[in-house]
A protein has these predicted regions:
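Nucleotide-activated sugar donor-binding and catalytic core shared by glycosyltransferases
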Residues: 1-180
Length: 180
């Protein structure tokens, strides 16, 4: 079953490239696409725009939105102070997630995805919307999960890993081989 609204999480560096590779294989049924990324992440925004411009050449009525949220944790920020910035990011994310009411969240990588996924879980707890959360752990994670992965392993509907060692350690995960 394909739903009308899809939400994609985008991240800096290689995470953006990984998620865009996944999206390149999706049909036009996954439209509109709502990208959510850190408000300070200009590089991902540029990559998304380029990706969507190329996609529009194939799918003429391709629709997408760009949405920014506060970053949970800046590089070199202390773990103790990141609790407050993460809570702020969750509070900021909930109205956005409520407005979009996505059917699916496809996410990978750094902590920016955690507030959006928590917001989606709140929608379900409040009986407003069941959002399917698909987390794809980065290809770079060979033996251990990222912090986001360790958190979302318990809350995602589908948790995909790209290395057999991770499947052995995390039995709920789905191993599909290298998918990005």
């Amino acid at each position: 079953m394909l739903a009308r609204h899809r939400t994609k999480r985008i991240y800096r560096r290689g995470h953006t490239t990984e998620i865009l590779r996944l999206l390149s294989s999706l049909s036009q049924s996954y439209s509109p696409r709502h990208y959510i990324f850190a408000d300070s992440d200009k590089m991902s925004e540029d990559k998304i725009r380029t990706f969507e411009q190329k996609r529009a050449e194939t799918f003429s009525n391709s629709q997408f939105t760009l949405n920014r949220i506060p970053r949970c944790r800046e590089v070199c920020q202390s773990w103790s102070s990141s609790v407050l910035t993460t809570l702020y990011s969750i509070l900021y994310s909930f109205p956005l997630t409520f407005r979009l009411k996505p059917d699916l969240i496809l996410c990978n990588g750094p902590g920016t995805c955690v507030p959006v996924c928590i917001s989606a879980l709140l929608l379900e707890i409040l009986a407003l919307k069941k959002v399917i959360i698909v987390y794809v752990e980065s290809i770079c994670r060979v033996e251990t999960l990222s912090l986001s992965g360790k958190i979302l392993y318990y809350f995602s509907d589908y948790f995909i890993v790209q290395w057999p060692a991770l499947k052995e350690k995390y039995p709920k995960s789905i191993y599909l081989g290298r998918i990005v």
